């Protein structure tokens, strides 16, 4: 009876430690995912800003050229 209690106690103890380690790894993985999302969001915002700036520059140039042609001052 005593050996059975000892083995059950050992089994419970090892299972608890194993579960604790799995939860720590899961939490660590979730933290890495948040950083990756932030990095992706940062890259996408940068690309969007660059495209927006380039689009504004191209549109401004096109409007200047069109107004020059319409007024005949070119």
Curated annotation (Swiss-Prot):
Keywords: Amphibian defense peptide, Antibiotic, Antimicrobial, Cleavage on pair of basic residues, Disulfide bond, Secreted, Signal. Residues 1-22 form the signal peptide. Pfam families: Antimicrobial_2 (PF08023), FSAP_sig_propep (PF03032). Expressed by the skin glands. Belongs to the frog skin active peptide (FSAP) family. Brevinin subfamily. It comes from Rana temporaria. Transmembrane segments: none annotated. Its main location: secreted. It is found in: Secreted. GO terms for cellular component: extracellular region. Residues 23-40 form a propeptide. Antimicrobial peptide. GO terms for biological process: defense response to bacterium. It comes from the Eukaryota. Disulfide bonds join 68-74. InterPro entries: Antimicrobial_frog_2, Frog_antimicrobial_propeptide. This is Brevinin-2Tb.
């Amino acid at each position: 009876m005593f050996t059975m209690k000892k083995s059950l106690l050992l089994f419970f103890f090892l299972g608890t430690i194993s579960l604790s380690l799995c939860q720590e790894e899961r939490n660590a993985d979730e933290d890495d995912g948040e950083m990756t999302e932030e990095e992706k969001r940062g890259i996408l915002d940068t690309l969007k800003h660059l495209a927006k700036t380039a689009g504004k520059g191209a549109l401004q140039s096109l409007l200047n050229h069109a107004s020059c042609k319409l007024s005949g001052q070119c």
